[in-house]
Amino acid sequence: MSRYSENIIIGAGAAGLFCAAQLGKLGKQATIFDNGKKIGRKILMSGGGFCNFTNMEITSGRYISQNKHFVKSALKRYTQWDFIALVAEYGIPYHEKELGQLFCDSGAEDIVKMLGAECDKYGVHIQLRSEVSDVEAVENNPKVRFKLKVNAVEWQCQNLIIATGGLSMPGLGASPFGYQIAEQFGLNVIPPRASLVPFTWRESDKFYSALSGVSLDVAVTNQHKTFTHQMLFTHRGLSGPAILQISNYWQPGESIHLDLLPYNNIRHHLDEMRQSSPKLQLKTVLSRLLPKKLVELWLEQGLIQDEVIANLSKVRLENLENLIHNWQFIPNGTEGYRTAEVTMGGVDTHEISSKTMEATKVKGLYFIGEVLDVVGWLGGYNFQWAWSSAAVCAMGIAES
């Protein structure tokens, strides 16, 4: 015999949990199925375990989608301030780290517990270790639009909400399930790729792996954007906030330009030093401005020569200027989904209502969160998209 829930949500991550709680709050029944052993697994890992749950400077211009204006409605109707108010209601201590980024003081578990408590409060049924299969549409029945199997048991529902996320962090249960459902029902899927992800070295740059663990502030630029933030050298390539941000705008084969001294000008600085301390060695001057290990590596590789700064030729000064302020780096690629924070691409937002997250072609089928072709900047933007898309989905169902 079939079981029934008015609203079935697949995925117990940020978007799925929040949508279920919001549905319950609006008087609607909701059931969540997830194949994992715990709810909110990705939330627990986020922000170094402290969950950067939103950003005070949310704006639609910091999201990427092939449908440029898609995010505007949801972000306006459920804002960062709405979510911050909920966090405050639960007495969760938090702080601003930088650039509007809000983190939990005690840990990401506070957010997961809050979402779990909201689901409990509003009677949401959560079933874990659940494999969903055989999703089908049911014709000519407004109360039963879909049927599916969960661990071989048939369930029916009026509304089916896909909150299965993207392909990033496969170790936490990521799968293409949401994309497969979209395609099954005739929706277009923008090819997914890893986003907010470190770059890897080409063979010619691998000597830089000796700097693994070294970080510095940089300005990183490509044809589309510039970000000024911290960069980290790793064994595999380049990481850190500046690199993760630019990865959203990078295309394979494209070069990025790195200014390793964004708050200073090496030519002006050396001109001043040649006036005041002409006998200083170049290594000494550079080691005061840049990580010493980086300067030593440049010397080892013959990219610079240690000499008295008074003797620096015009050509060597120009080469040094390019090395520091205009390092043209062509990534070999990215580290891929294993370390990517999120997935770019996904269900085509041209085929989704921006007001309700319902598929325009399929009544009762909704997509929320990362499964959609929406990706935000690093810094709480993607969590806010989860909250906002989930909230307007619940509103849309309650109003229909």
Predicted regions and their residues:
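Core beta-strand elements of the Rossmann-like FAD/NAD(P) dinucleotide-binding domain
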Residues: R3-S5, V150-N159, F227-T228
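N-terminal Rossmann-like FAD-binding beta1-loop-alpha1 element of flavoenzymes
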Residues: S5-I32, C393-A398
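Short hydrophobic core segments
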Residues: I8-I10, F33, V132, W155-G171, ...
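Glycine-rich FAD pyrophosphate-binding loop
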Residues: G24-G48
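An anion/pyrophosphate-binding glycine-rich loop and adjacent beta-alpha core
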Residues: K38-I39, L44-M45, T54-S60, P93, ...
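Glycine-rich active-site loop/strand segments that organize a redox cofactor
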Residues: G48-E96
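A glycine-rich dinucleotide-binding beta-alpha-beta segment and adjacent secondary-structure elements
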Residues: L128, E296-V375
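A conserved short coil-to-beta-strand element within the FAD-binding core of flavoproteins
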Residues: L128-K143
